[in-house]
């Protein structure tokens, strides 16, 4: 009585199919698949966003920054 055989599970599956209908079960499977795919894409997007933010230019020039080489060449 502790474990169910394959026949018990087949009977349960047939009853569930009769109650909900195969179309409803198929649409639930599709919805679950879309949810899993959306979750995976969301997790993949989390990894991509910090890499894009870190790709900012490493040198930031402000108005007070002077390029010495350019200044020396213009004086020569």
UniProtKB/Swiss-Prot annotation:
GO molecular-function term, one example from the UniProt record: protein transmembrane transporter activity
Residue span of region Disordered: 39-76
Location in the cell: Cell inner membrane
GO cellular component, one term: TAT protein transport complex
Chain intervals with Basic and acidic residues compositional bias: 39-50, 64-76
TM helices/strands, residue ranges: 1-21
Gene3D superfamilies assigned: 1.20.5.3310
Pfam families from the UniProt entry: TatA_B_E
Membrane topology, record value: Single-pass membrane protein
Keywords per UniProt: Cell inner membrane, Cell membrane, Membrane, Protein transport, Translocation, Transmembrane, Transmembrane helix, Transport
Homology family: Belongs to the TatA/E family.
The protein's assembly and partners: The Tat system comprises two distinct complexes: a TatABC complex, containing multiple copies of TatA, TatB and TatC subunits, and a separate TatA complex, containing only TatA subunits. Substrates initially bind to the TatABC complex, which probably triggers association of the separate TatA complex to form the active translocon.
Biological function: Part of the twin-arginine translocation (Tat) system that transports large folded proteins containing a characteristic twin-arginine motif in their signal peptide across membranes. TatA could form the protein-conducting channel of the Tat system.
UniProt cross-references to PANTHER family, sorted A to Z: SEC-INDEPENDENT PROTEIN TRANSLOCASE PROTEIN TATA
Record-given protein name: Sec-independent protein translocase protein TatA
Species, as recorded: Herminiimonas arsenicoxydans
Gene transcribed to yield this protein: tatA
């Amino acid at each position: 009585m502790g474990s169910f055989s394959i026949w018990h599970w087949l009977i349960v599956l047939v009853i569930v199919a009769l109650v909900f209908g195969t179309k409803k079960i198929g649409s639930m499977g599709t919805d679950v698949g879309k949810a899993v795919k959306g979750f995976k894409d969301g997790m993949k997007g989390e990894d991509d966003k910090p890499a894009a933010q870190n790709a900012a230019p490493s040198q930031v020039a402000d108005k007070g920054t002077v390029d010495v080489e350019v200044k020396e060449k213009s004086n020569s």
